[in-house]
């Protein structure tokens, strides 16, 4: 009797493993139920295709901020914004190639040239402001930088009692 109860318990607890499932795409590899019966490579390709095919697009409806009916004045065609004129002039001028010669002695500097704040490129002997008569005002630039970094704080006057 003990053997019969032991036999019934073992039959209930023993589960036969499922046979491996081949990939749905018939690539020869085994698939998984977690990946829709596809192998890892086919599933990765499937996810790529589905995300590319249906990109998420959010359409925002335009709603006016105020419902007031104020008439708008049409722009005059004769007036052209100043920014547009400057853009046209900048587009007409071709960009200058970077200078690879010293502005003082015209010596070729190549990649070893020093850029100055005045806008020029100089060799190792003319890189200092005294050597090339620099037009940039370093003192004023320093004062402006300090003034910008340390704003003036004015305290309120104290009322005497």
Swiss-Prot record:
MF annotations from Gene Ontology: DNA binding; zinc ion binding
Binding positions for Zn(2+) 2 per the UniProt entry: 102, 105, 123, 126
Gene induction: By cold, dehydration and salt stress.
Keyword Ribosomal protein annotated: no
SUPFAM superfamilies, alphabetized: AN1-like Zinc finger, Glucocorticoid receptor-like (DNA-binding domain)
Zinc finger (AN1-type) in chain: 96-142
Zinc finger boundaries on the chain: A20-type: 17-51
Comp. bias regions, Basic and acidic residues: 75-90
Disordered: annotated span: 62-99
Annotated Gene3D superfamilies: 1.20.5.4770, AN1-like Zinc finger
Residues annotated for Zn(2+) 1 binding in this entry: 23, 27, 39, 42
Keyword field: Metal-binding, Stress response, Zinc, Zinc-finger
Binding, Zn(2+) 3: 116, 118, 132, 134
Function: May be involved in environmental stress response.
Name under which the protein is recorded: Zinc finger A20 and AN1 domain-containing stress-associated protein 9
